Amino acid sequence: MLPNTGKLAGCTLFITGASRGIGKAIALKAARDGANVVIAAKTAEAHPKLPGTIYTAASEIEAAGGKALPCIVDVRDENQISAAVEKAVDTFGGIDILVNNASAISLTNTLETPMKKVDLMMGINTRGTYLTSKICIPYLKKSKVAHILNLSPPLNLNPIWFKNHCAYTIAKYGMSMCALGMSEEYKGEIAVNALWPKTAIHTAAMDMLGGSGVDKQCRTPDIMADAAYAILSKPKDFTGNFVIDEELLKHEGIKDLDVYAVSPGHPLLPDFFLDESPEALASAMEEHGATAAFKAGKAQAKSQDSSPLQETFKAIESLVNEEAVKTTQGIYQFVLSGEESGNWFLDLKNGKGGVGSGEPSTKADVVMSMDSGDFIKMFTGKMKPTMAFMSGKLKIKGDMGLALKLEKILGQMNAKL
């Protein structure tokens, strides 16, 4: 890992969303230099599903050698940001570094994204980044080491990154456009850069998006913290860059990136928005055994009258039980196209559960549309739902929470198939 050099000693960092995940990891890295850290986040009380609060983060920062100022901040609220900035200046004498880390995500298509979610993503990602930067800039201009770092991707305009989650991409690219514009506007005064991971990072958000077992395909937030530290240690003339964590750390002399892996040696899940298309990424992962997290299905005896799809559903049916119903409580409908088109359902909500062709007797909680061939691959462990969704091969309507449970269900089924 990248060693601390002390370059951030005495610097004051204002980090949004720093109560957990990547934001907290960056805060702890800076704290080891003896930096002051303003934890600007919403979580003041423990969340039932998400770890950490601004106060637990503050304790960790101080234990690491830094000084912490926890502030309750919703980056959509101008008054809360202004109050936190003023408190930071009063406490530490100024602000040297702003890290715009707070973000919201919904990987849903246009018709399936309620305007409430659109407003949330635009408000936190784009507007929140712009607003927090605007309020901090007068103080940053007084610093000799002024930096703004946005955790956002390169501006890749390949339509593949828009078609499945247009609202999220627009909101995330808004953060990147802030970096692009402000780096030129404040050249010579404030360094402004963007940082994005090459691979998935294991955070609470990734657990929610990727489902059970996704952690093995991720790196820890430490890789982003080390990359951020490298950027923030550079002079002001390092500005206007869209940095990828892995590439920067290799340039900094880090040769063993496996130290950042949650499960060293396991194939990694590529992140969104990078040059390679999702389809190519999915193929590359399969070539390198990325589906090894789920055991390949054992050969099933096929009758001459049964199609591969029918055999797949027979295998699924043999594994449906009351325990699966109890833990899932959802009805899945599969709208399949291609060689074996038609509707099928998986009932993991009623009685002992059930599988069948056609539509379920009660309304499905989740409707999944895909090619029948890809469906067979997904249910026999040869394709992960996460990659199917990322590559556009799987369309989802309905309860996304239940959709995310499918990966865990498949893992359990594939272990027995």
UniProtKB/Swiss-Prot annotation:
**Cellular location of this protein?**
Peroxisome; Mitochondrion
Gene3D superfamilies (UniProt xref): NAD(P)-binding Rossmann-like Domain, SCP2 sterol-binding domain
Q: Is Transmembrane given among the entry's keywords?
A: no
Q: Which is an annotated GO molecular function term of this record?
A: oxidoreductase activity
Q: Where is the active site?
A: 168 (proton acceptor)
Q: Which SUPFAM superfamilies match?
A: NAD(P)-binding Rossmann-fold domains, SCP-like
What are the record keywords, sorted? Answer: Mitochondrion, NADP, Oxidoreductase, Peroxisome
The Gene Ontology CC terms held by the record are: mitochondrion; peroxisome
Q: Where does NADP(+) bind?
A: 17-23, 42, 74, 172
Keyword Mitochondrion appears in the UniProt entry: yes
Matching InterPro entries: HSDL2, NAD(P)-bd_dom_sf, SCP2_sterol-bd_dom, SCP2_sterol-bd_dom_sf, SDR_fam
The EC category is oxidoreductase
Main subcellular location? other
Q: Where is the SCP2 domain?
A: 306-414
The organism sits in which domain of life?
Answer: Eukaryota
Protein EC: 1.-.-.-
Q: Which family does it belong to?
A: Belongs to the short-chain dehydrogenases/reductases (SDR) family.
Write out the function statement from the record.
Has apparently no steroid dehydrogenase activity. Might act as a metabolic regulator that affects systemic adaptation to nutritional cues.
Extract the PANTHER family matched here.
HYDROXYSTEROID DEHYDROGENASE-LIKE PROTEIN 2 (PTHR42808:SF3)
Q: What is this protein called?
A: Hydroxysteroid dehydrogenase-like protein 2
Q: Which organism is it from?
A: Xenopus tropicalis (Western clawed frog)
